[in-house]
A protein has these predicted regions:
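Active-/binding-site microenvironments in catalytic and ligand-binding cores
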Residues: 1-263
């Protein structure tokens, strides 16, 4: 079978419903939770604004459209290497210079939802990834690795989604050795269902924020605020995560989706 036959078969499977397209993005609007940074550290992304230009009225009698004010790292979004200082020198580290081939890849879904239901500060380590591989198969070069936590169930309550107290945010994520391990396997990137790709308490790790620090140092990518990972198999799905082609963009909101076999 050649590549043309393969694509033709995929089209038939999509039309028949034997391959399902699963939406992995949350809604994007004024109520979308956004990351809160320490006031003495950096400025926050402003809240998302949606403004009507016209809707079949005197400003536009036959059409409706809006303008949108939104930060690059808002809602379900893509982190490009230039987002972090360790990835600042890559010519192809921006949303308008990343090879488009990298936006479509197989995805490995590591289910940590039982652990995170009991412990919001749960950390996935390299041993946990290796145990998952022993059960489901190896992570291969060029594939995504995503951490299922079902944290998206909190997204309609910003306080619960950020889950912060006087000691900072409390949300699950990877350890340093987890990120080092998936990079050693050749993963193209790492994704989570939380506000960012790192755990809430990752600032205290060495190096701090390892998902950001190490992934982008290796010219790899991050996905945050993913939804519906419970609808994906551990292996076998194809992830599509294409950022807007923002000039010199460090990231972008995305409509992430997955192709999932159903029959």
């Amino acid at each position: 079978m050649n590549s043309a036959d393969t694509l033709s078969n995929l089209a038939a499977l999509l039309l028949s419903g034997k391959v399902e397209v699963v939406d992995l993005s949350g809604r994007l609007g004024p109520d979308t939770p956004l990351l809160k940074l320490p006031p003495d550290f950096a400025r926050d992304t402003p809240k998302i604004e949606l403004h009507k230009i016209s809707e079949y009225d005197s400003d536009g009698p036959f059409w409706a459209w809006n303008w949108l004010k939104v930060g690059e790292h808002s809602g379900t979004h893509f982190d490009a290497p230039h987002h972090w200082i360790t990835g600042k020198d890559y010519a192809d580290g921006y949303t308008d210079s990343i090879p488009v081939q990298n936006f479509v890849a197989p995805v490995n879904v590591i289910d940590c939802s039982a652990e995170t239901a009991k412990n919001p500060d749960f950390l996935l380590d390299a041993a946990g990834v290796q145990a998952w591989e022993a059960k489901h198969g190896e992570i291969r070069k060029g594939e995504w690795v995503v951490m299922r936590t079902d944290w998206d169930s909190r997204v309609n309550d910003e306080a619960a989604y950020l889950n912060a107290d006087a000691t900072g945010p409390h949300s699950p994520g990877p350890t340093v050795d987890c990120i080092k391990y998936i990079l050693s396997k050749g993963a193209i990137g790492w994704g989570t269902q939380c506000i960012g790709t790192d755990a809430g308490q990752a600032g205290g790790m060495e190096p701090p924020y390892p998902a950001h620090n190490l992934l982008h140092a290796a010219n790899k990518y991050g996905l945050a605020s993913l939804a519906n990972l419970s609808k994906l198999p551990a292996k076998g799905a194809i992830l599509i995560a294409a950022p807007l082609k923002i000039v010199s963009g460090t990231g972008s909101p995305i409509r992430a989706m997955a192709l999932v076999p159903r029959g």
